[in-house]
Amino acid sequence: MNWLTNVVRPKIRNILRRETPENLWIKCPDTGQLVFYKDVEQNQFVIPGSNYHMRMGAVARLRAIFDNETWYDVALPEVVADPLKFRDERKYADRIKDARTKTGAHDAVRVGFGKLETSPVVVAVQDFDFMGGSLGMAAGEAIIRGMELAVEKHAPFIMFAASGGARMQEGILSLMQMPRTTVAVQMLREAKLPYIVVLTNPTTGGVTASYAMLGDIHIAEPGALIGFAGARVIEQTIREKLPDGFQRAEYLKEHGMVDMVVHRHDLRPTLARLCRLLTKSPALTVTTAVEAPAEAAAKAEPEATTTEQPVAPAPTEPPAQPAAPQA
């Protein structure tokens, strides 16, 4: 009987049991309500009702920004994976391996080149799911390569920052990326190219002491945590209670640290408008002409109808194939 109850019956139950995905529902951190994950995903990871902005992966960011959800993944320089042979509770190499398996990304920063409302742009995205979006050698090289490509293509550079700071497992090599990325920003300025930074939740630590706060325009998502040190550390240092909302996007806007707070649904048109403004490109216009009856009849004839649409030239340098939309 033990064989029947302990072996056969559990196997039958496993066969008949309906599999339920672990991420079928998602809980809003603000209100606690349970929301269907697909609804949140289709809403650009904004909780319906509460408008709470969830963290957004690099691929989802790029899909939301580029025309037709298509872009070129920029080939990034290879770096030494574990230069210090660092180990705490686990080997750093094992942590990197797990993060790559979890996110499908090589490191915390992904760079894409494509069109934003028909204008070429270079976009770099930090993925907080990859070791907290920490800034290491690979991330620093990715950001610098993205800025170099922007100069080569004479295109605006857009940076989506989301990080807990420098990657401690790489020590001084990680901290060295702060001045290196700062020098790369100066390269954009000398080329007179727009550098727009989108500060997402959270943007803290060393990135706020380098490239994340050096943009021509700083945009923050609603409710984003932005700052160098944590609020508790500051309170213990100055021995004072911090005001409500300290280090949040809205507080920083009121005190002049960011230029605007933009809802995620409005981010793409806002970025496109800023790029056109800063590059002095003509605005997109939609015109409706009233045609004479004779002209309308002539255009109705198949042999007289011509449909000409501008064809964007294919990028010449960025490598590999266009990144296909990912579910």
UniProtKB/Swiss-Prot annotation:
The keyword Ribosomal protein does not apply. Residues 312-327 have a biased composition (Pro residues). Keywords: ATP-binding, Cytoplasm, Fatty acid biosynthesis, Fatty acid metabolism, Lipid biosynthesis, Lipid metabolism, Nucleotide-binding, Transferase. Belongs to the AccD/PCCB family. Residues 293-327 are annotated as: Disordered. PANTHER family: ACETYL-COENZYME A CARBOXYLASE CARBOXYL TRANSFERASE SUBUNIT BETA, CHLOROPLASTIC. Its EC number is 2.1.3.15. Residues 293-311 have a biased composition (Low complexity). GO terms for molecular function: acetyl-CoA carboxylase activity; ATP binding; carboxyl- or carbamoyltransferase activity. Pathway: Lipid metabolism; malonyl-CoA biosynthesis; malonyl-CoA from acetyl-CoA: step 1/1. Residues 24-293 form the CoA carboxyltransferase N-terminal domain. Disulfide bonds: none annotated. HAMAP family: AcetylCoA_CT_beta. Acetyl-CoA carboxylase is a heterohexamer composed of biotin carboxyl carrier protein (AccB), biotin carboxylase (AccC) and two subunits each of ACCase subunit alpha (AccA) and ACCase subunit beta (AccD). This is Acetyl-coenzyme A carboxylase carboxyl transferase subunit beta. InterPro entries: AcCoA_carboxyl_beta, Acetyl_CoA_COase_Trfase_b_su, ClpP/crotonase-like_dom_sf, COA_CT_N. It catalyses: N(6)-carboxybiotinyl-L-lysyl-[protein] + acetyl-CoA = N(6)-biotinyl-L-lysyl-[protein] + malonyl-CoA. Component of the acetyl coenzyme A carboxylase (ACC) complex. Biotin carboxylase (BC) catalyzes the carboxylation of biotin on its carrier protein (BCCP) and then the CO(2) group is transferred by the transcarboxylase to acetyl-CoA to form malonyl-CoA.
